[in-house]
């Protein structure tokens, strides 16, 4: 549970240096407890709870941990267990890298490509939703992104940590003058 993670706070810096993955369901899209762990050194991956997306980001977290020898936290909104897809075991057999890879944009983009190829998905570190011709954009994560994108463009985060500044800046249209960061 998200509250249970708070008991691990003192251990997370050490766990961040090990290839471990935590999967945490965030009921009712309440991310406050999970987001308190941003400064722990552990990578953080978010998925909205759509079963196929949740499966893909979970696999991304495992490959990230295996290739970089770093800990990862995959948190996702509540999903119905009956709707979860069944991933073949062969997809999850990712050997530990003999030498840890540097946690760089190149490594991360390679892992996203690997997962998309294996599962036939199109997951990304972030996604821009809604209209692009505006002077305001909101950056956020959560299930509400789809609803709000009808009013203002939304940059929906999926790779919360490490957050690529280059990727974030490149995703914002040049017409934008104001950026709102929405956190709940």
Task: Enumerate the predicted regions with their spans.
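Generic secondary-structure signature for well-ordered alpha-helical cores
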Residues: 10, 14-17, 39, 56-70, ...
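Short beta-strand segments
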Residues: 21-25, 47-48, 73-77, 140-141, ...
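Gly/Ser/Thr-rich loops at beta-strand to alpha-helix junctions
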Residues: 1-5, 51-53, 79-81, 140-147, ...
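Gly-rich Lys/Arg/Thr-decorated short loops/hinges at beta-loop-alpha junctions or inter-strand turns
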Residues: 21-23, 37-42, 102-110, 127-135
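Flexible glycine/proline-rich, aromatic-decorated loop/lid segments
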Residues: 28-38, 171-172
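Thiamine diphosphate
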Residues: 1-33, 39, 44-65, 118-184
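Conformationally flexible catalytic loops at phosphate/diphosphate-handling active centers
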Residues: 69-128
């Amino acid at each position: 549970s998200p509250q249970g993670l708070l008991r691990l706070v003192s251990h997370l810096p050490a766990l961040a240096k090990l290839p471990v993955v935590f999967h945490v369901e965030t009921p009712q899209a309440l991310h406050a407890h999970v987001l308190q762990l941003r400064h722990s050194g552990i990578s953080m991956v978010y998925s909205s709870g759509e079963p196929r997306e949740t499966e893909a980001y979970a696999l991304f977290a495992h490959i990230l941990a295996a290739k970089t020898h770093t800990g990862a936290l995959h948190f996702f909104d509540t999903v119905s267990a009956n709707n979860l897809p069944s991933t073949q075991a062969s997809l999850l057999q990712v050997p530990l890298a003999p030498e840890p890879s540097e946690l760089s944009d190149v490594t991360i983009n390679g892992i996203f490509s690997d997962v998309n190829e294996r599962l036939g998905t199109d997951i990304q570190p972030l996604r821009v939703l809604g209209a692009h011709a505006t002077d305001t954009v909101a950056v956020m994560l959560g299930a509400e992104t789809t609803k709000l994108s009808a009013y203002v463009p939304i940059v929906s985060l999926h790779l919360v940590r490490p957050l690529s500044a280059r990727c974030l800046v490149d995703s914002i249209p040049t017409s934008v003058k104001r950026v709102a960061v929405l956190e709940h």
